[in-house]
Design a protein with these regions (language model features):
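Two-component histidine phosphotransfer core
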Residues: 1-18, 22-154, 158-160
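C-terminal end segment of the histidine kinase catalytic
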Residues: 165-169
Length: 169
């Protein structure tokens, strides 16, 4: 059984669909908070709504700062799923170049790296995301802050040249 949502609108047919497994786990995390932390449960559900709205709208180009807000929403959802395991350092919008991308172009590879890391390492994860000044790419640095002996990982995310220029090819 495929655990991806079919019918996702996308400007790029190769873009990553949203994982049903991810959505179900976020809903389970929110459900676990309803009685003990209802405000946190509401926040998780609001973030999930924002996440799905960003990813499932028809094909379009978005500013890089909007995509990074989407990455921030994603990291909050993962923090709800894995309390205490993920620490994220994301650039502020004022530190970003004025590049553009498609929805999920940055978030999907970040999610792949985070999921791989959390699956392979039992400790906490520190994710630091940095953008190149020219807007051509970003770099995700993943490491385990509590165990410096664990080798870190770097993931380079190259933005599609057509979207950097502000349009689809």
């Amino acid at each position: 059984m495929d655990d991806r949502i079919e019918g996702q609108a996308s400007a790029d047919p190769g873009s990553a669909p949203v994982s049903v497994h991810f959505v179900n786990n976020v809903l389970a995390a929110a459900a676990s908070l309803i009685d003990v932390e209802p405000d946190s449960a509401r926040d998780v559900l609001a973030d999930l709504g924002a996440f799905l709205s960003h990813r499932l709208r028809p094909a379009r180009i978005v500013p890089l700062d909007q995509e990074l807000e989407h990455v921030a929403t994603y990291t909050r959802l993962e923090q709800a799923r894995f309390p205490g395991r993920l620490q994220a350092e994301l650039p502020s919008s004022r530190d970003l170049p004025s590049a553009q991308c498609t929805p999920g172009e940055v978030q999907a590879p970040v999610a792949d790296a985070v999921n791989r890391w959390l699956g392979e390492h039992p400790g906490r994860l520190r994710l630091a995301l940095r953008a190149r000044l020219d807007g051509s790419s970003l770099e995700a640095q993943l490491d385990e802050p509590d165990d410096p002996s664990v080798a870190g990982e770097r993931v380079r995310i190259v933005l599609t040249p057509a979207t950097i220029a502000g349009g689809l090819a």
